[in-house]
Amino acid sequence: MQIKAEEISQIIKDQIGDYETSVDLNETGTVISVGDGIARIYGVQNCMAMELLEFPSGIMGLALNLEEDNVGCAVLGSVQGIKEGDIVKRTGKIAEVPVGPAMSGRVVDGLGKPIDGQGPINSDLTSKIEVVAPGVIARKGVHEPCYTGAKAVDAMTPVGRGQRELVIGDRQIGKTALCVDAIIAQKNTDVHCIYVAVGQKKSTVALVVEALRKHGAMEYTTVVAACASDPAPMQYIAPFAGCSMGEYYRDNGQHALIIYDDLSKQAVAYRELSLLLRRPPGREAYPGDIFFNHSRLLERASKVNDELGAGSLTALPIIETQAGDVSAFIPTNVISITDGQVYLEPNLFFSGVRPAVNIGLSVSRVGGSAQCKAMKQVAGTLRLDLAQYRELAAFAAFGSDLDVSTQAKLTRGERLVEILKQPQYQPLPMEKQVTILYAGSTGHLDSLPIGSLAAYEADLYDYLEANEPSVFTDLVAEQAFTDGIKEKLNKALTSFGETFKAIKGLK
């Protein structure tokens, strides 16, 4: 068989013509050691800080230490399938999470991947987990209230939109309960909520999600869960991921509320990471930049100015203390970063005062700016009455014969403490809060036994809704106690008080 030269040259030309010159160019590195959730990688020369790196098994890593001859990478998953010599690819992307309305009602991990079994999240919007906080010029003073639904908090230590209010206290005294109630209280408002669970048991997170779902709050809430069994890097980045989700609403002229539950466990996760990366330890073995870690997270909560849409991101970080020690390293750090704190005390909790807010140690640095006029009108006398009550109660314990004015102050104080108690999952709107506080501070409760006040409060709301609904609607419209509202309310309180005493057989 004779092969013609022309045919051969034609075949070669065809092959050259069909040849695709695409080059798959990847910058890769090699794993030189792996263990305890940290991989050391050689060769990724142009790697950026906080860049995502991809391991052969599809697991992602986060570049934290950029050293001369290697990169210290936190593995965001199990290290079981990673071994020395594995090829690692650069993604060229800084760690980011999906954001936007599609996240509402979902439970996700620290990278924004769904873990609730409800299918993938269809969101084209993403945001970097590390974003610089708005500058001074971009901000506006906090001036709108963000109601938590808890009478003790909204009256004494009010939270405004764009504020950072720390919730601090020992374990198991209602910190999470207070914050979950704050989420439920946003039900009929335009506030989107993000709940970040760090280092919690999965069963605890499931209970919170179930409570939110039961009260119709999951519709506007995103839960970011980095549980106790998740790797330390996931627990470290979860609050930043949740913050990015909240910032989407703030930057689009909307309002968001984020709960960090809790930052003590995030600090422990960051300490673990830092020590494994051989960073020098400082006080209590925390790294030197632990303060910066918390401040750059909490500074992202802000109220932005009108030119940027007047949106806000309000933060309620939680810190767990050991035996009430608020002078430990992490509590003092976060107290100094935030705009006030709500201090929950075990003694109050176990004596039946729930929420167990210690009014003396709790403070809001925004104060009256975050309250409507109606709340200011009742809260001013309330704080004074309670302060006098606490002072007199200490002395009254030693003597039995008290003069009439002292006895009156003690009577008033006992009733005010009682009406500040509130059951879990029952946050109150502003108009109901100011109504019962007004009744307490004007003496309408002084003649009632303490044990009957819970029933009095519940029946009072029903009575007003049935017989004087204009009191609530006027309070919402005016946001203040006008002479007309006071007159109507005083009349209703007197009438209801007589009816209540008659029904309960009280004198």
Curated annotation (Swiss-Prot):
Record carries keyword Aminoacyl-tRNA synthetase: no
UniProt keywords, alphabetically: ATP synthesis, ATP-binding, Cell inner membrane, Cell membrane, CF(1), Hydrogen ion transport, Ion transport, Membrane, Nucleotide-binding, Translocase, Transport
SUPFAM superfamilies attached to this UniProt entry: C-terminal domain of alpha and beta subunits of F1 ATP synthase, N-terminal domain of alpha and beta subunits of F1 ATP synthase, P-loop containing nucleoside triphosphate hydrolases
Matches recorded under CDD domains: ATP-synt_F1_alpha_C, ATP-synt_F1_alpha_N, F1-ATPase_alpha_CD
This enzyme's EC code(s): 7.1.2.2
Membrane topology classification: Peripheral membrane protein
InterPro entries noted in UniProt: ATP_synth_asu-like_sf, ATP_synth_asu_C, ATP_synth_asu_C_sf, ATP_synth_F1_a_nt-bd_dom, ATP_synth_F1_asu, ATPase_a/bsu_AS, ATPase_F1/V1/A1_a/bsu_N, ATPase_F1/V1/A1_a/bsu_N_sf
Record-stated family: Belongs to the ATPase alpha/beta chains family.
Record-linked HAMAP family: ATP_synth_alpha_bact
Subunit structure: F-type ATPases have 2 components, CF(1) - the catalytic core - and CF(0) - the membrane proton channel. CF(1) has five subunits: alpha(3), beta(3), gamma(1), delta(1), epsilon(1). CF(0) has three main subunits: a(1), b(2) and c(9-12). The alpha and beta chains form an alternating ring which encloses part of the gamma chain. CF(1) is attached to CF(0) by a central stalk formed by the gamma and epsilon chains, while a peripheral stalk is formed by the delta and b chains.
Name of the protein: ATP synthase subunit alpha
Organism: Desulfotalea psychrophila (strain LSv54 / DSM 12343)
